Amino acid sequence: FPVQIFKVKEGVNFNPGDPNYDLFQLALKTSAQRLFPNFSFIDAPFNLQYYRPGDYNTEVAYMGCRTRVMGNVYDPTKEVTCGRGNLSFTSINLPRLGIEAHGDIDKFFKSLDDMIDLVIRQLMHRFKIQCSKVVRNYPFLMGQGIWIDSEKLNINDQVGEVLKNGTLSVGFIGLAETLVALTGKHH
């Protein structure tokens, strides 16, 4: 950290002839050697549905851990990047599940389903604890109006209504190693 996010957009830097195509090529070369920067493809179908030309708030954002912040289940009218963030994340250790499955794909997916359920319960528990905190527990984020609607709160108000605009993430690690554990080879 800090992590650099390189935004890619047709007409800006994606295609040969775009004004900043050379910068995109340099970013690709750098990423091939250093694994950074990360890339945000604004025109990808799952991002483009939120994008409104000229409104940077509607350009999808990624956190340092590559968590995508855009969709808002709580309030779809606030599907923007500014004033929001990822509240908590948990990564599932896929190789462990693969090793424990001893090559049994059905057992692996059953274990994965169970683990996802556990992680969701864990994230919701953590969210409940975070929501019980008050503005003074987050003096910068809430006290300075950084989060959406936090300027409406007083110093001793709970922050739950504001945090509902955030995200909770389930991630995974070790996909290639999991394939080796289950099938003997990876991609």
Where does each model-flagged region fall?
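Conserved catalytic cores of very large enzyme subunits
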Residues: 1-165, 185-187
